[in-house]
Amino acid sequence: MFKPKKSRNRRKEPPLAEGRKAVRGNVETTEPLRLGFAVKILGRQNLKSNDSRRWRQNPHLRVSLGYLERIFDYLAANDIRMYRMSSDIAPYITHPDFTQFHGQIEECRDELRALGRRARKGKLRLSFHPSQFIVLNSPDPVLVQKSIADLAAQAEMLDRMELGSEAVVVVHAGGTYGDVDEGCNRWIKTYRTLSPKIRRRLVLENDDSRYSAADVLKIHDATGVPLIFDHQHFLCYNPQGLDLGPTVRKFMGSWPAKVRPKIHFSSPRTELRELKRRDRKTRKSTLVLQPPVWTGHADFCHPFEFITLMRALEGAEFDVMLEAKSKDLALLRLRRDLQRYAPAVAVRFGLPALRHIPDESRTILVEENALEAAAMRSSRNAG
């Protein structure tokens, strides 16, 4: 169980990296761009991201924060300065039937403050990305109010950690319900009812099949909500035919002047998919090979796609959240790929130039073993 270290110095520290510049000596410099990943750790065994026990076992945010403390150790050891926390970090925090869980955030105020202090000290950018069940544009007012309650809880945790405005809660626009324009209007209407604490944290992302980059830009124009550009989603769903470069820069321009924007990057899966098909008469299952679906995320990031994007955005300052299936392993591999194939891009992320081309056979073996171990754990949990 995580116990925060006591400190005699109660002076509040400044928010995390609100500005985009750092001062070293008398010289103003730009902080390196950051690479991040989401939730699960695959590079080290037994690092849980949240307390996933069922309600009868009394799960608690305090247990999740203990896991998060260990994750912070791993991030620091690998010089990773951006991380998306599990949106289930506070179990049942807003569940209407389990009011005994509703006070977890207040109960963990000291632990949250301590972890926030550590994040600020390490310049670690944190965020949440709630599930697809957070729908602000639903015609059902009950679902909208539940979504708002969940957003309020996640915003409160970031506030209790005393993090700056770079720590955000990322959402999608929601369902279309047969009319994209009306869906946008409902989202705008709901946004205007949100508390300032939620608005300060909330950012909106374009998606891969419903709300395009053009759609969320319209929502931004009406609300001022900052936008996250998702590269793979843009490639999969851009019916208006927007150009990539100008669109990304519009998204970045939607952020407040002193808050660094961030984007999402992933590569599409290209391999065949194995699907089980059950015969209705015999009830026997057979494996069927199907072509890939381009909205699916690959295990790793294609380095040359990433390099091309970064060169197209030369001079822009932003952080990149990687949404590859291999999580931290994909981030560490992309770093090495940048150093090898695009040293000028690697420098933007603060990575040193390679003096020689390394033999990667040992590293690849370690990655394969980690992925196999993760697959085995997943299989046991499913069983």
Listing of model-derived features with the role each one plays in the protein:
Residues 170, 201-208, 323:
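Catalytic beta/alpha-barrel core
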